[in-house]
Structures are given as C-alpha cells and as structure tokens.
Amino acid sequence: MLLALVGVTGVGKSYFKEKIVENFDFEKVNTIRTRAKRIGEEDGKSGIFMTKEELENLKLQGKIAYNFDVFGGTYAYLKDEIFSEKNMVFEMHYTTIEDWKKIRPDIKTIYILPNDIEIAKEKARKRNLSKEKELERIREIEEHYNRISTDENLRNMFDYIVYNNYDEKSEKEILMLVKEILDKKY
C-alpha cells in the first residue's frame, strides 16, 4: 500500500509519518530533494539530498517515478519505493494529487487539517528558514488552507480528511485511521 499524508506546512506530516512507521508495518518513501539541507536535516534520514544533475541522471536511468518543482527546488520519488509491495508512507504536496492518482490509482491519501492555522504558521516560523523563505511558507500556508477550505472538488480528491489539534487525542485518531485503512487492505 502507498499512503500519502497531505496538509499545510506545520500540520505534522513528518511527525505522523514517523509515528506510522513506528506503530505499523510501514516504511518511509525517501523524498529526493535538490534544495539545500536545513539545520538539523540529515541526508538519508530527512530525505535524499542531491544536485539537479544527479537527479537528472536518475531520470535518464528510468529510476524516478515522479518529480515536481515547489518551493524553489525539485522533489522526486524512486520507482522502487513507489511501486513496492511493502506498505510505504510519504508526504505529498496537495497540488500533485491528480498526478499521483494516475501514477498509483490505488494510493490512499489522508489530508491533515490544523484545527488552528496559527499553530501551523508558528511551526513554520521555527524551521530555521531565511526570512524570505519563511514569509513564502506563511503565504503558502494561507493560500493552501483557503483553497482546501473552499474547494469542495479538491477536498473530494482525498480519501480521508482529519483534523490535528496538536494533542494526544488527534494523534490517536490519526493512528486509528491508519489501522482501519490497513485492516481494509487485508
């Protein structure tokens, strides 16, 4: 199964990805990134960091399932992981939902909405970004949140929509949902 976690920056996608791997039989899809590493990020743990040229070589070798540009960098995913028979989990940008449904029609998507958008913005501010990038992310959070809140067609593209109140109850609800999805698979 391929499970995608979707939501605004700061909603907890990385946190929940770790919890899903910790609690269930899932492995993380390694997101390839051409952007510079942020403070605290490690190659192989926070994703795979490479140059655009290195990524281009993987594409020429036919090893990339999908790539897209966002936030001034290119993000890509390896075919071996995207088409694996194993349970795999990754973070997906909401604008790529239609592409992913074509690549893996059986993909399961969980859209995580923050109960309080200000908490998501605050978490984005704590990411050690340049002031310019921070402002770009805050604008993107607002734009993304407004779009998902008002666009019913967009919301309907996701299999599940859950709320994160950044508390234990929200965590339990999201993990229970993953368990239910897994139970349906078997």
What are these regions (language model features)?
Residues 129-178:
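Small-molecule kinase domains that catalyze NTP-dependent phosphoryl transfer to phosphate-bearing small molecules
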Residues 8:
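P-loop (Walker A) phosphate-binding loop of NTP-binding proteins
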Residues 22-30:
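Post-Walker A helix-loop "phosphate-sensing" segment adjacent to the P-loop in P-loop NTPases
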Residues 13-14:
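Walker A/P-loop
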Residues 5:
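Hydrophobic anchor at the beta1->P-loop junction of P-loop NTPases
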Residues 89-93, 102-125:
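Conserved phosphate-donor/acceptor-positioning beta-strand/loop module used by diverse small-molecule
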Residues 33-88, 94:
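ATP-dependent small-molecule kinase phosphotransfer cores
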